[in-house]
Amino acid sequence: MDNLFTFLHEIEDRYTRTIFNFHLISCDEIGDIYGLMKERISSEDMFDNIVYNKDIHPAIKKLVYCDIQLTKHIINQNTYPVFNDSSQVKCCHYFDINSDNSNISSRTVEIFEREKSSLVSYIKTTNKKRKVNYGEIKKTVHGGTNANYFSGKKSDEYLSTTVRSNINQPWIKTISKRMRVNIINHSIVTRGKSSILQTIEIIFTNRTCVKIFKDSTMHIILSKDKDEKGCIHMIDKLFYVYYNLFLLFEDIIQNEYFKEVANVVNHVLTATALDEKLFLIKKMAKHDVYGVSNFKIGMFNLTFIKSLDHTVFPSLLDEDSKIKFFKGKKLNIVALRSLEDCINYVTKSENMIEMMKERSTILNSIDIETESVDRLKDLLLK
């Protein structure tokens, strides 16, 4: 981890990170984080009864447990704004909302109706304007006019699906779905594949998302703010997430180890100089501290900070290159999966930029109308 941050610091005057995803590999020493969190979330409907430590409340926006038989969101109401009458309701026509109408539940309903949650994304995706049923086309070919075509409504406790078809082309379906959600206090309960099954999600107020899988391996999607400047801000954001995450784990699974790790993490946060932060991270790796010793890069992207003011020559790119050009003027390096990968493609990027500058200078110095075709081919295609 420290070597990665050291290199990102070396190039931060030229490149900035965008997407940054990583994993924390499961360790036997820390116990069944997934199982204990699942048990707590499944049995409670108040945020305070899941997250006891009020010091970390401002950092955590929502907890989500997803399985085929139960999808449950627990929201922290205090992290949401007070809505006025003109606040846009995003999702009423997709959901049948059942609530006990208490003050707490009514506030959760208000938030749910206005937040673009994963449930909204899920139901929008499953509502298909048109879908071809190829099985029914086959029936038509082999069965003639007596083939049966389905249209109508089918439903279970949580999902109602309406299928409509045109009499002239009955194998082309229009599908609409409505999902039932039960809202009790801070909980939003339904069923279905609205996220990755058998996962727990912790959504932070800074938009970072932590996904915990059944074996307690974690996938962390680190958010990016416009005001993030350089590697030191990135370290602070990552370790801020660590600090609150580990205190949450200590809260739920009652393992003092996480409180100790949170204290070590806090030393990184309070250090003011980058060199000091990197020294502490290296020390954590040496002592096999959770969060550093089991850190594994998932994928990250870099963007070249400056716009390219010279001609771009796509012919210089390999077919499977991770270097991409956005609108011809923004250079991105995508899907980097290791420090070695990063160093390799940054080096290629730097060399390519220099080659493009040289070719651009030559191209600008010649008369395209009178120059030979072979000469232009050499410049543009090789």
Swiss-Prot record:
Q: Does the keyword GTP-binding apply?
A: no
Family to which the UniProt record says this protein belongs? Belongs to the orthopoxvirus OPG150 family.
Q: What is this protein called?
A: Intermediate transcription factor 3 large subunit
Q: What outcome is documented for mutating S43L in this protein?
A: In strain: Garcia-1966
Matches recorded under Pfam families: Pox_int_trans
Q: What does the function comment of this entry state?
A: Acts with RNA polymerase to initiate transcription from intermediate gene promoters.
KW Transcription (keyword) present: yes
The induction field says: Expressed in the early phase of the viral replicative cycle.
Q: Coding gene?
A: OPG150
- TM segments? none
Q: How does it assemble?
A: Heterodimerizes with protein A8 to form the virus intermediate transcription factor (VITF)-3.
- Tell me which UniProt keywords the record has, alphabetically: Activator, Early protein, Phosphoprotein, Transcription, Transcription regulation
